[in-house]
């Protein structure tokens, strides 16, 4: 039973990634068939992202009311219907219409699953589950390419992904009883917290509520059945939790730097390093390979390393990757092992940046119960998901403006600035949560895997 539910969660993370890169891979053909400019893909992406942000912000109240199992099942159903809608779209405006349920479903399932896994499973599973997302994001474009190469329309690619999503939806509805068994009577998931963390959470929640007035204000008691205990926290209440603002900001800057690297590293290679455009497009894939493989490794290392150590280690490797971009610009024409030296630096840089990014996202999510208590986890993770999409949407275009006016040579410097901002916010998060936990006298959750 436990193993089957975990298998369902792994499949759910693969399904999260499946449609994410479909639009980008199919759009060169889609925009011609739909008779719209190439730039219109940005409108579809923006609408999906805005709906995702909206549903992420509402995820806590929905999760408390319906539970993780139902939210996941209905959200995947919603995304499956939206993908079927994409496959039937014969105009750009139909795409915009179906982008709304796609974004709403994606945001809800992302926040719900991350909340559930953070409470119920070890850091190993959190990293491997996000590795599954990377596999799904890689499989999606491959399926679309397979369909297109055999002479079928892009709509058949979406149809095939929709069928896969429908199969997962069926399994999710079959598994609703398993999710329900693991939900606490108060609507807060308890279940399989690793290494006795459940007991620590209950004891610590009570102690915090009895020690300081500030803690009493911020806590939602796990052992009460009152309506107040079940009520979703307001955004203002969340921000009053020590370290919450820094946690949300850390997520914002992390997702901004990941999206900036993925979006602009190719342009930096082409326009600043004079690398062939086709080769540059292939090299960008190394960054995502580094993220996927890095999360697999992080799952192994999490048996010995705490989430904090994984995050700080990842940030260090990320900075190493960024630093390798600087000598790449100074090594034009030089050779090493039959390759241009600048290409060697770029390959190493992209791999290190991917490996560095790998543990940060899942480890921040997984450490949320430890830093803020299980009763606040759903609220924090919903806001983390929203800040992730806002960071991905807002700061990469800022570099586009800078590149237009000052050149793509600014790319490594911009990445350094975002990295420093992320590191500063994360260090502030550690400082404030550790100060708060000293007031509470003992840790909230054992962070051992």
Model-identified regions with their sequence ranges:
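Helix-to-loop junctions at the C-terminal end of transmembrane segments
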Residues: 55-67, 294-307, 403-404
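Conserved MFS/SLC helix-loop-helix module at the cytosolic interface between two early adjacent transmembrane helices
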Residues: 54-93
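Extracytoplasmic gate region of multi-pass secondary transporters
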Residues: 23-24, 241-285, 289
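C-terminal transmembrane helical hairpin of 12-TM major facilitator-type secondary transporters
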Residues: 308-364
């Amino acid at each position: 039973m436990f193993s089957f539910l975990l298998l369902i969660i792994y499949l759910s993370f693969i399904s999260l990634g499946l449609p994410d890169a479909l639009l980008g891979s199919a759009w060169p053909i889609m925009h011609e068939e739909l008779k719209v400019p190439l730039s219109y893909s940005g409108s579809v992406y923006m609408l999906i992202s805005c709906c995702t942000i909206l549903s992420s912000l509402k995820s806590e109240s929905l999760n408390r009311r319906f539970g993780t199992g139902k939210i996941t099942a209905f959200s995947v159903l919603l995304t499956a219907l939206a993908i079927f809608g994409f496959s039937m779209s014969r105009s750009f405006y139909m795409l915009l219409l179906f982008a709304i349920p796609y974004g709403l479903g994606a945001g809800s399932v992302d926040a719900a699953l991350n909340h559930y896994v953070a409470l119920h499973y070890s850091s190993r599973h959190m990293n491997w589950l996000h590795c599954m997302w990377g596999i799904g994001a890689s499989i999606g474009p491959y399926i679309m390419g397979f369909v297109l190469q055999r002479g079928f329309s892009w709509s058949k690619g979406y149809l095939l992904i929709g069928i896969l999503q429908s199969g997962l939806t069926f399994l999710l509805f079959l598994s609703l009883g398993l999710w329900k068994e693991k939900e606490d009577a108060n609507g807060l998931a308890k279940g399989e917290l690793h290494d006795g963390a459940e007991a620590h959470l209950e004891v610590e929640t009570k102690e915090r509520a009895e020690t300081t007035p500030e803690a009493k204000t911020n806590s939602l008691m796990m052992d009460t059945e009152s309506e107040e205990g079940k009520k979703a926290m307001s955004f203002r209440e969340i921000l009053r939790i020590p370290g919450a603002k820094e946690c949300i900001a850390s997520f914002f800057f992390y997702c901004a730097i990941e999206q900036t690297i993925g979006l602009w590293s190719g342009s930096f290679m082409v326009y600043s390093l004079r690398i062939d455009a086709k080769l540059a497009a292939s090299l960008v894939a190394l960054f995502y390979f580094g993220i996927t493989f890095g999360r697999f490794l992080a799952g192994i290392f999490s048996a010995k390393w705490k989430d904090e150590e994984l995050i700080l280690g990842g940030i260090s490797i990320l900075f190493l990757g960024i630093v390798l971009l600087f000598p790449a610009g100074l090594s034009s024409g030089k050779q090493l092992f039959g390759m241009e030296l600048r290409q060697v630096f770029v390959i190493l840089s992209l791999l290190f940046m991917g490996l560095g990014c790998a543990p940060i996202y899942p480890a921040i999510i997984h450490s949320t119960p430890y830093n803020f208590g299980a009763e606040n986890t759903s609220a924090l993770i919903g806001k983390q998901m929203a800040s992730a999409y806002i960071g991905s949407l807002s700061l990469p275009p800022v570099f586009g403006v800078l590149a237009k006016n000052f050149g793509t040579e600014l790319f490594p410097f911009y990445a350094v600035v975002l990295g420093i901002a992320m590191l500063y916010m994360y260090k502030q998060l550690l400082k404030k949560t550790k100060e708060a936990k000293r007031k509470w006298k003992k840790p909230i959750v054992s962070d051992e895997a």
